[in-house]
C-alpha cells in the first residue's frame, strides 16, 4: 500500500507526531480519553438525507413509554436542496449540520426548535465525499472520499462560532490489487484514531493528532474482491472495532484495537447478520450492537459480551423499512433510528425492551410524501456524554 500526503508536511512534524502518538497510547486496548465538548444547542432532533427528493428532513423525538414515541417534523422541514445529499454530520455543539454533495460540504445552523438555516459563505469544495465525522473535542470535521484507486481523508478545522470549515490536512492512500469504494469514516471516542471502510478496498487505520489535525497511516485490512466492508462502529473505550461486511465472509466482524491502532480479529468473528451487513451501531451503553441488512430489510441485534463478542438478541432480526441503510441512536440513548432508502417506511424508530434487554420494539415511523424518498442517512444530535 502506497501513502501520499499533502504537500507542506515537514519531516520534523512527522517525528513530533510519532513521539506524541507514543505518549497517547499505552498497553493493548488502552487510550488516553479525549474529553468530548458539551452540546450548546439542546433538544432531541434527528435529520434524514433524502437522495430521491434532494432534501433533508428534520424531526423532534418525543419520549413516551416503552414502545411509544413520536417523530414530529421541525419547522421548515423538509429543506429542499439544490443538490443530492451524500453524507451528513452534526457538530459536537449541536449548532451545525454538515451536508455533503458530490462537490461540496454545506453548512446549516440548527435552531433551538431544530429548524435548519443555510449559512452563506461557510461551505467548502470537496470532491466525492461519502462520509463525515466530527472529533470528540469538536475541533475537527473529517471527510472520506476519493476514487476507485485512491482514498482521501480531508481534515477541516471547525469555527465554533460560524461552523465554517478550514482545510488543514489531507491524507491519501491506495490499496494494491483492489478497487476502492469509500463507504464510512469513524473517529474513535478517544479521538486519537480514525478508521475508514473502503468497500472492496478493505479498511484503513490512521493515528490522529487532535492538536494539529495531522493524520498518520498505520494499518490496512485487505479483503477479497467479493467482499465489501461498509460500516464501522467503535466502542466507548476504544477497545473494539465493529465492521459491517457484505459478500464473502459477510457479517459483523469484531477486531480488538491495540497499541497505535493495531487490529486483531477476535474469536468467533464474523457474527451472523444474514451475510449482507451494511452498517453497524452500538447503543449508548455499549452493551448492545445493531447491524442493518439492506438485502432483507432487517436489523440484527446482539448483546456485547466480554472482549467484544456478540450474541444474537431474542427476536432478532427485526423488521425495518426496505433497504435499511443507516442507523443512529438518539441523544437520550432511548431510541434507535433507522433510515431506509426503499421506504415503507422511510424512517423507523425503535425503543429498547426493558423485560428483554436490548430487544427492539417499534415506537414510531415516518412515511414521507414521496415514498420512497431515498432516505439513505440518519444522524442524531450528540448527548455530550
Where are these regions (language model features)?
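Short loop/turn segments immediately following the C-termini of beta-strands
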Residues: 51, 102, 145-148, 158, ...
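A short beta-strand motif characteristic of beta-propeller blades
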Residues: 72-80, 117-124, 167-176, 216-223, ...
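Bacterial Sec-dependent N-terminal signal peptides
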Residues: 2, 17-49
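Repeated scaffold domains used in trafficking and secretory/extracellular systems
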Residues: 84-89, 127-133, 179-186, 227-233, ...
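Short loop/turn segments immediately following beta-strands, especially the blade-tip
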Residues: 58-69, 107-115, 155-164, 205-214, ...
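Residue-level detector of Asp-centered blade-edge/turn motifs that repeat once per structural unit
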Residues: 40-42, 90-94, 134-137, 187-190, ...
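Blade-level signature of beta-propeller repeat domains, shared across WD40, Kelch, NHL, RCC1
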Residues: 342, 346-351, 355-357, 361-385
Amino acid at each position: 500500500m502506497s501513502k501520499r500526503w499533502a504537500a507542506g508536511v515537514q519531516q520534523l512534524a512527522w517525528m513530533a507526531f510519532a513521539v506524541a502518538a507514543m505518549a497517547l497510547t499505552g498497553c493493548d486496548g488502552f487510550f488516553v480519553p479525549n474529553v468530548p465538548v458539551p452540546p450548546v444547542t439542546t433538544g432531541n432532533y434527528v435529520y434524514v438525507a433524502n437522495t430521491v427528493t434532494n432534501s433533508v428532513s428534520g424531526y423532534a423525538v418525543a419520549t413516551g413509554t416503552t414502545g411509544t414515541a413520536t417523530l414530529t417534523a421541525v419547522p421548515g422541514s423538509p429543506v429542499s436542496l439544490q443538490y443530492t445529499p451524500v453524507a451528513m454530520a452534526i457538530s459536537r455543539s449541536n449548532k451545525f449540520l454538515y451536508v455533503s454533495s458530490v462537490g461540496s460540504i454545506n453548512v446549516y445552523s440548527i435552531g433551538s426548535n431544530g429548524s435548519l438555516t443555510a449559512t452563506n459563505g461557510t461551505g467548502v469544495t470537496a470532491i466525492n465525499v461519502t462520509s463525515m465525522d466530527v472529533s470528540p473535542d469538536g475541533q475537527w470535521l473529517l471527510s472520506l472520499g476519493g476514487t476507485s484507486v485512491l482514498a482521501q481523508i480531508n481534515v477541516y478545522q471547525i469555527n465554533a462560532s460560524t461552523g465554517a470549515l478550514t482545510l488543514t490536512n489531507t491524507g491519501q492512500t491506495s490499496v494494491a490489487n483492489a478497487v476502492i469504494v469509500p463507504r464510512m469514516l469513524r473517529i474513535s471516542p478517544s479521538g486519537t484514531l480514525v478508521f475508514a471502510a473502503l468497500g472492496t478496498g478493505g479498511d484503513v487505520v490512521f493515528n490522529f493528532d487532535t492538536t494539529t489535525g495531522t493524520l498518520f497511516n498505520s494499518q490496512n485490512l485487505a479483503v477479497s474482491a467479493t467482499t465489501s466492508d461498509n460500516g464501522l462502529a467503535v466502542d466507548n473505550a476504544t477497545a473494539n472495532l465493529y465492521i459491517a461486511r457484505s459478500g464473502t465472509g459477510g457479517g459483523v466482524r469484531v477486531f480488538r484495537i491495540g497499541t497505535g491502532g493495531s487490529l486483531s480479529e477476535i474469536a468467533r468473528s464474523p457474527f451472523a447478520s444474514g451475510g449482507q451487513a451494511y452498517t453497524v451501531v452500538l447503543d449508548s451503553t455499549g452493551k448492545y450492537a445493531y447491524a442493518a441488512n439492506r438485502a432483507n430489510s432487517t436489523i440484527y441485534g446482539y448483546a456485547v459480551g466480554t472482549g467484544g463478542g456478540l450474541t444474537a438478541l431474542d427476536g432478532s432480526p427485526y423488521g425495518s423499512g426496505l433497504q435499511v441503510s443507516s442507523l443512529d441512536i438518539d441523544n437520550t440513548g432511548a431510541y434507535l433510528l433507522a433510515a431506509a432508502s426503499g421506504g415503507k417506511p422511510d424512517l423507523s424508530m425503535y425503543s429498547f425492551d426493558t423485560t428483554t434487554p436490548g430487544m427492539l420494539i417499534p415506537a414510531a415511523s415516518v412515511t414521507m410524501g414521496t415514498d420512497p424518498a431515498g432516505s439513505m442517512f440518519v444522524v442524531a444530535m450528540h448527548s455530550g456524554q
